[in-house]
Amino acid sequence: MTKQEFKAITKELFFFNKKRLMLWIAILIFVIAFAMIIVFVPFFNFNDKIKSLFDKLKHINWQDPTALFGLVFSVLGYLITALSIPLKVFELMLMLRFRLMLAKLIKDGILDPKAFIDDIRHSYLSRRKQRKLEEEIEYLKRIKSDY
């Protein structure tokens, strides 16, 4: 990959104008809020679940490390579950943006798909990753033939 290709990729990938950045932030906030609602609403029906949670907290032996570890890890589990959904959506949005950026660079003639894939291929060792890479090559060839 040449220096010009690298600059073009980073410019396309990391260039955000204010409107686009605000849209990404709004989408991310919406996804986080939606995920937190999905994860935490069942616990806020103020019935037996909340009462039992407070009863458990009242009866925890704070000197017992096992109970403290259980409490800490259960809270961490809820937080990880709540955050994993928006992070996955954000990852998918970034992958889509990267594919669109690659298509634009190939269409403009800045990026040579064969050289780009050959550079990446040297870092992949497993056969599964090689197969996925071959599928990506076919995808990039279709993009180039469409334009």
Swiss-Prot record:
Listed GO CC annotations: plasma membrane
Compartments in which it is found: Cell membrane
Key words, A-Z: Cell membrane, Membrane, Transmembrane, Transmembrane helix
Regions that span the bilayer: 21-41, 67-87
Keyword Membrane tagged: yes
Entry superkingdom: Bacteria
Membrane-topology descriptor: Multi-pass membrane protein
The protein's name in its UniProt record: Uncharacterized protein UU158
Protein species of origin: Ureaplasma parvum serovar 3 (strain ATCC 700970)
